[in-house]
Regions:
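Intracellular juxtamembrane helix-capping segments at the cytosolic ends
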Residues: 96-114
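C-terminal transmembrane helical hairpin of 12-TM major facilitator-type secondary transporters
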Residues: 50-100
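Juxtamembrane "helix-exit" motif on the non-cytosolic side of transmembrane helices
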Residues: 12, 16, 71-80, 139-147
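A late C-terminal transmembrane helix in Major Facilitator Superfamily
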Residues: 109-145
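Extracytoplasmic gate region of multi-pass secondary transporters
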Residues: 1-24
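Transmembrane alpha-helices of Major Facilitator/SLC transporters
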Residues: 4, 24-51, 65-69
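Alpha-helical transmembrane segments of polytopic membrane proteins
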Residues: 25-36, 88-94, 152-167
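Multi-pass alpha-helical transporter architecture, strongest
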Residues: 143-146, 159-185
Length: 185
């Protein structure tokens, strides 16, 4: 679900926000700042020696990203954020959730449970499922000839995906912790 949302943001950002009066480099600058913030956060995980602690903190990071995404989407009208601020917060929360889960989460998961293998299978499987969702959305739009209001769609999907992923990652975090404590007995 996070991959579908990321694809929509990246592929249809010009349709989501009308920034015709802004520099064409604005999107790149926002994503550069987001990337640097996330790299800084990820660098801190090099100091975690305990894999279960790192894994649970990564889950917390994903949940925080999802909850922020949900909050900003659900209360968009109330918050009355400027489009650039809204885009920055949405990008940061989406990429924190997506990149955390898509990258270092699987490394720590494999290390925590001493699974023989590498992250390639997990990442390929998640990518396949995500791209299948994107293709389904775009095919439905094209074949049913649906006109979309991209901003409303993105905000609605962000709210829904953020809420669902928050719940699922909370459950997953509890299950991972329980499994880890059972294996350590």
């Amino acid at each position: 679900m996070l991959l579908v949302l990321r694809d929509i943001k990246e592929d249809f950002l010009v349709n989501i926000l009308d920034m015709s009066n802004q520099s064409s480099w604005l999107f790149a600058r926002i994503d550069t700042i987001v990337t640097l913030v996330i790299l800084g956060i990820f660098a801190l995980f090099a100091f975690f020696r305990n894999n279960i602690k790192a894994l649970l903190w990564l889950m917390t990071l994903v949940i925080a990203g999802c909850l922020t995404m949900t909050y900003v989407s659900f209360f968009y009208e109330t918050l009355n954020l400027p489009p650039i601020t809204w885009l920055f917060i949405q990008s940061l929360s989406l990429y924190i959730a997506y990149l955390t889960f898509q990258t270092i989460f699987f490394d720590r998961f494999i290390a925590c449970f001493r699974i023989k293998g590498n992250v390639g299978f997990f990442i390929a499987m998640i990518d396949f499922i995500g791209y299948l969702g994107t293709v389904t959305l775009l095919s439905t739009k094209e074949f049913l000839n649906i006109e979309l209001e991209w901003f409303a769609l993105f905000n609605h999907i962000s709210c829904t995906v953020g809420a669902i992923c928050s719940i699922l990652f909370i459950i997953a975090g509890l299950l991972i912790y329980r499994k880890y404590t059972q294996e350590m007995k």
